[in-house]
Amino acid sequence: VPAEAEGEFAIRSFSRKTLEGVCERFLDIIKGASLIAGVDYEIKEGTFFFNKIPVLKLNELLMNNAKLAGAPQLAPPREKTGSTDFGNVMYEIPGSCIRVAFVPEGTSSHSQEFVDAGKTEAAHNCILYGAKAIAGASMDLIMTDGLMDQVKEEFAENKKKNQ
């Protein structure tokens, strides 16, 4: 039996509120396990990653521009997503993700097939589609009266719901 052991854990959730509860439960489990084993423990907390704040108006704007750019196999936004570093950004400013496929349907995102597909012309084209969608959405936000305000209002409402 080693005199010392070390573990690293990443705890994620689809919402910041749920994440806080899961973290509390995890700490209780560590405390209980240390009592049962008669050992001490030390916890060093790292960076917390939060869920994304949805802004459907912004997502719709990006999707429409991605379609105009000719992006293939656009997927609708996910209803729930895990925590991510981009979620932390989206707690400060409105953001959105568009998902343009460059891998065959059903390919696991954590696989060698996905990595290999990322080196293809289709993947490089997706960068262009994304850039065109962002440029078009930016132009719409600048040129359409009140559109930026709508995005900001939806962001503020959804941020309140997610805290």
Model-derived features with residue positions:
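Metal-dependent amide/peptide-bond hydrolase catalytic core
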Residues: V1-Q163
